[in-house]
């Protein structure tokens, strides 16, 4: 059985107040002066004080083995802030730190360890505030308004580096080879790790480590680094430094899922919902010039226009990619929304998913068997449901304590307003009819004979994504649904959490004293007309799931208040994020893929054409991380996702899976 919880660090604090690992019998940092040692070994060993002002790119990438207390990261962040203050006009604008940690500290232990360095408190407090729950995989933290990105990879570094997507190859400018001493933790210091470090290092990239062990020096040399010894810190005689002076040949493990970015920094986004809003912010943060074309007269008039939407992860015992993506997407979304400098109605009141029949009870039992962190999800017995939700249901279930609800329409509008303040250009009532390549750009033809030319285009227009020749064969489908808006009652006013059953019910929004109840489901439909049948069906599903609950019977839908929208979905319930695949070229190039994997070319795609679609009913959960993934891909930056999970988001995945098995592929 796959477990989705990471074991925390087993440590104690010695007489000097230094954290010590019980498992490895080693200190996390020097009792003498850990801060100065970090500055000497890692910042000095990689010559960062000299390299920062001379760096020719806007982003500097550092990777580290063993995050521990975060001392190396915090020290580097402090130094980077000092550099930016002293060199405001420098080419280098942002710092990206990637670290691997098998046994992460708890938030409490992290805060206790940070008390050692009062001068780092301004940075340490920001790290503590966003410290992620112990889930495997990558946790992206956006710090200092996005100027500093921290990717925390929880798990074994030798496993995680082998699971990296090829897009991370040759991205690392400097390596901090840290961790417990080789004699204490020999499982980490392997040739596989040294080879991975070399593969990920940019030509000209450097490394530094506190150890001078001969097998470490020889292993790094064998991997491709040019190594030298340097005087060690304090009483330590020697340490090691290295540089990648050659350009190593790069492996391509799965070319059919290869992702390509763009050297250009100008893009048009087509759409008007939450995907467009969040992607605009992510691209603007990376220095892109962004223009948005919305077919409607205002934003959030499509699937993103609801008054209340639930935020919680989609989990399944039988789908590892689904679990890995949605658990990390959910935790990223909470961190993202919490630091977003815009106002929107929301309440992180928790979400409880109830087992209202035998099938749903079995599904919940399977989810609970996955050893999930209690911060993510916990079981709740029937007699406790009323206490935590405020209403009686006579059902047990699973509760997501960090879930809740938010107003998607308000979020989308206000994020777009923020993006406009940062340079986003928006054109409303621009209905894209078709697009074509012209002189290494995309020519966009809109209704009313309007035209525009852009270097890069992102299609993020929901269920209308397949209306163009380049996307007409995508395996996506429309789902029309109606959400009912119901006035509160004395009993409903007691509801403290979002309830999920064969539908969902939100607590009242204090702004309007209404609840949302929904939603109907009509696959293949794009009908947005009000339906009295759907209105009654939303009420009846609630009653059918909780037949003994008097409060459910008193739900009133007679005022016909509702909102109808159309979602875009996929068969496997995962979004489609990445390059727009070329269907015809894919069939030609991969006609013999099942027999000739070793000869496969890179995935056929349309140059500089991307898509962000098929968010289904979990867009509030998935959109923030998907926006970050796509913006990173487009900008040729590290992507916060392992290769196999990232492949599960690739727009060509459903075709390629069949082709890998030698099966026929049909359009749509």
From Swiss-Prot:
Region listing for tRNA (mnm(5)s(2)U34)-methyltransferase, in residue ranges: 1-245
Key word Cytoplasm present: yes
Positions of the UniProt region annotated as FAD-dependent cmnm(5)s(2)U34 oxidoreductase: 270-668
GO cellular component, as recorded: cytoplasm
GO molecular function: flavin adenine dinucleotide binding; oxidoreductase activity, acting on the CH-NH group of donors; tRNA (5-methylaminomethyl-2-thiouridylate)(34)-methyltransferase activity
EC numbers on record: 2.1.1.61, 1.5.-.-
Matching Gene3D superfamilies: D-Amino Acid Oxidase, subunit A, domain 2, FAD/NAD(P)-binding domain, Vaccinia Virus protein VP39
Catalytic activity: 5-aminomethyl-2-thiouridine(34) in tRNA + S-adenosyl-L-methionine = 5-methylaminomethyl-2-thiouridine(34) in tRNA + S-adenosyl-L-homocysteine + H(+)
GO biological process: methylation; tRNA wobble uridine modification
Entry cofactors: FAD
Keywords recorded for this protein, A-Z: Cytoplasm, FAD, Flavoprotein, Methyltransferase, Multifunctional enzyme, Oxidoreductase, S-adenosyl-L-methionine, Transferase, tRNA processing
Chief localization: cytoplasm
InterPro entries attached to this UniProt entry: FAD-dep_OxRdtase, FAD/NAD-bd_sf, MnmC-like_methylTransf, SAM-dependent_MTases_sf, tRNA_MAMT_biosynth_bifunc_MnmC, tRNA_MNMC2, tRNA_S-uridine_synth_MnmC_C
Signal peptide feature range: none
Key word Transcription regulation present: no
Subcellular location: Cytoplasm
Family per similarity comment: In the N-terminal section; belongs to the methyltransferase superfamily. tRNA (mnm(5)s(2)U34)-methyltransferase family.
Function: Catalyzes the last two steps in the biosynthesis of 5-methylaminomethyl-2-thiouridine (mnm(5)s(2)U) at the wobble position (U34) in tRNA. Catalyzes the FAD-dependent demodification of cmnm(5)s(2)U34 to nm(5)s(2)U34, followed by the transfer of a methyl group from S-adenosyl-L-methionine to nm(5)s(2)U34, to form mnm(5)s(2)U34.
Protein name: tRNA 5-methylaminomethyl-2-thiouridine biosynthesis bifunctional protein MnmC
Species of origin: Shigella boydii serotype 4 (strain Sb227)
Classification of source organism: Bacteria, Pseudomonadati, Pseudomonadota, Gammaproteobacteria, Enterobacterales
Gene: mnmC
């Amino acid at each position: 059985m796959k477990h989705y919880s990471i074991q925390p660090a087993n440590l104690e604090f010695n007489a000097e107040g230094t954290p010590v690992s019980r498992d490895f019998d080693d200190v996390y940092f020097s009792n003498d002066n850990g801060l100065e040692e970090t500055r000497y070994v890692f910042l000095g060993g990689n010559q960062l004080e000299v390299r920062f002002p001379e760096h020719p790119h806007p982003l500097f990438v550092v990777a580290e083995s063993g995050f521990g207390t975060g001392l190396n990261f915090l020290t580097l962040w402090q130094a980077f802030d000092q550099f930016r203050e002293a060199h405001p006009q420098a080419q280098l604008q942002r710092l990206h730190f990637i670290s691997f940690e098998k046994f992460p500290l708890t938030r409490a232990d992290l805060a206790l360890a940070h008390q050692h360095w009062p001068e780092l408190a301004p940075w340490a407090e920001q790290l503590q505030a966003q410290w992620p729950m112990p889930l495997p995989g990558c946790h992206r933290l956006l710090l200092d308004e996005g100027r500093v990105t921290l990717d925390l990879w929880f798990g074994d570094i030798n496993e995680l580096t082998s699971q990296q997507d090829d897009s991370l190859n040759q991205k690392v400018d400097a390596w901090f080879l840290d961790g417990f001493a080789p004699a204490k933790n020999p499982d980490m210091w392997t040739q596989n790790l040294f080879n991975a470090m070399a593969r990920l290092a940019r030509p000209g990239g450097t490394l530094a480590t506190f150890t001078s062990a001969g097998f470490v020096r020889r292993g790094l040399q064998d991997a491709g680094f040019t190594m030298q010894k340097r005087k060690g810190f304090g009483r330590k005689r020697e340490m090691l430094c290295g540089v990648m002076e050659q350009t190593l040949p790069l492996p391509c493990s799965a070319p059919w899922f290869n992702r390509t970015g763009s050297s250009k920094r100008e893009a048009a986004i087509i759409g008007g919902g939450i995907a467009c809003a969040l992607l605009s912010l992510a691209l603007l943060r990376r220095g892109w010039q962004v223009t948005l074309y919305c077919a409607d007269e205002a934003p959030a008039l499509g699937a993103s226009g609801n008054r209340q939407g639930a935020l919680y992860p989609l989990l399944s015992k039988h789908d590892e990619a689904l679990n890995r993506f949605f658990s990390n997407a959910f935790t990223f979304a909470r961190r993202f929304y919490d630091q977003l400098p815009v106002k929107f109605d929301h309440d992180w009141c928790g979400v409880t998913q109830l087992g209202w029949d035998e099938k749903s009870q079995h599904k919940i039992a399977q989810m609970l068997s996955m050893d999930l962190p209690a911060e993510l999800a916990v079981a709740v017995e029937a007699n406790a449901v009323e206490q935590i939700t405020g209403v009686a249901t006579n059902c047990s279930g699973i509760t997501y304590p960090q879930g809740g609800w938010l107003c998607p329409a308000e979020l989308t509008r206000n994020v777009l307003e923020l993006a406009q303040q940062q340079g986003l250009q928006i054109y409303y009532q621009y209905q894209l009819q078709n697009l074509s390549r012209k002189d290494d750009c995309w020519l966009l033809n809109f209704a009313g004979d309007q035209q525009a030319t852009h270097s890069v285009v992102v299609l993020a227009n929901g269920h209308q994504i397949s209306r163009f020749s380049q996307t007409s064969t995508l395996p996506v489908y429309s789902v029309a649904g109606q959400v009912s808006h119901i006035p509160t009652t004395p009993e409903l006013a007691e509801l403290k959490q979002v309830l999920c059953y064969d539908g969902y019910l939100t607590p009242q929004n204090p702004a309007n004293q209404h609840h949302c109840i929904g939603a109907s489901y009509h696959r293949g439909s794009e009908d947005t007309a009000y339906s009295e049948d759907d209105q009654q069906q939303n009420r009846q599903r609630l009653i059918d799931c909780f037949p003994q609950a008097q409060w459910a019977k008193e739900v009133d839908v007679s005022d016909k208040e509702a909102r109808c929208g159309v979602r875009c979905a996929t068969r496997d319930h995962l979004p489609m994020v990445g390059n727009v695949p070329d269907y015809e070229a894919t069939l030609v190039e991969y006609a013999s893929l099942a027999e000739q994997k070793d000869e496969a070319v890179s995935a056929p795609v349309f140059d500089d054409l991307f898509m962000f679609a098929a968010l289904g009913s979990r867009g509030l959960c998935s959109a923030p991380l998907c926006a970050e993934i796509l913006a990173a891909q487009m900008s040729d930056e590290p992507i916060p996702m392992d290769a196999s999970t990232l492949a599960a988001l690739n727009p060509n995945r459903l075709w390629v899976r069949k082709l890998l098995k030698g099966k026929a592929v049909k359009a749509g």
